Amino acid sequence: MGDLEKKLFRLERERIEKERLYRIMDRDLLETVEEVFDRPTLMALYDLVNDGVIGVMHGVVSSGKEARVYWAEDPKGRDLAVKIYLTMTAEFRRGIIKYIEGDPRFHRVRRHPRKLIYLWCSKEFRNLRLAYDAGVRVPKPIKAKSNILVMEFIGDPEVRGRPAPLLKDMPPKDPERALDTILDYIYKLYNKAELVHADLSEYNIMNRNEELVIIDWGSAVKKSHPMQAEFLERDVRNILRYFSKLGVDVPSLKEVLSWIVGS
């Protein structure tokens, strides 16, 4: 196949791919997505559509420097959250290396920006699956593809397509019970999944009608990670601090850590 034939073949494939994406999102949304995401991301999104994982894409529900989260539906109309990691900045790359290099699951760290963001997405998916299997309430993981993570959408029961509020914006009605729930999740995470969230606070716990759901699992590390004790202590301290501000008579940091690690 000559250069001209290859170019024509590529252009025809791009046209077919774009037509397929038009079926799951309106043209304004697709144009916005094309402005933000590169071709490999669009190809991965196309594959998820072609594989029957995503049926319809709606708008952005959360946007940050590292990722955007979209409300979507699967082909059967069930709500999904589609988290798409953006091109990795040098600052983000420096920030995540410590969560990867000490993790035995990712002993061959690739520092190429694209490969690193794919690894980070895969890491979050695997952490979600381990936490979910251990009985921790997290968004159910569905699929990871390149820099795209598909999972359960934790929505506001009152308005479809709107995410449930964060704990920082919607304090629990029964703080004592909520504290017990979160500490139980940390215990299960450590002793069943053998993980530490490593970034736990009221900023990444959702409150859906008093059901607490922990999100943002990219930073979670295995118990064998050299910094796991430091991360665990920080997680517990953050939770105790938050609930103490709500007026709860919280246990001491030492007491909680001893209970979790069994010493």
Regions found by a protein language model. Name each.
Residues 33-163:
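Conserved ATP-binding subdomain of kinase catalytic cores across diverse folds
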Residues 22-25, 105-108, 163-165, 214-219:
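A short alpha-helix capping/helix-coil boundary motif
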Residues 171-178, 191-197, 208-263:
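C-lobe/activation-segment region of protein kinase-like
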Residues 112-138, 144-145, 162-198, 203, ...:
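Conserved kinase catalytic-core helix
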Residues 86, 155, 202, 207, ...:
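Short, glycine/acidic-enriched loop or turn micro-motifs at the edges of active sites
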Residues 1-21:
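Long, low-complexity intrinsically disordered regions enriched in Ser/Thr/Pro/Gly
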Residues 14-38, 47-48:
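N-terminal, Lys/Arg-enriched amphipathic/low-complexity engagement segments
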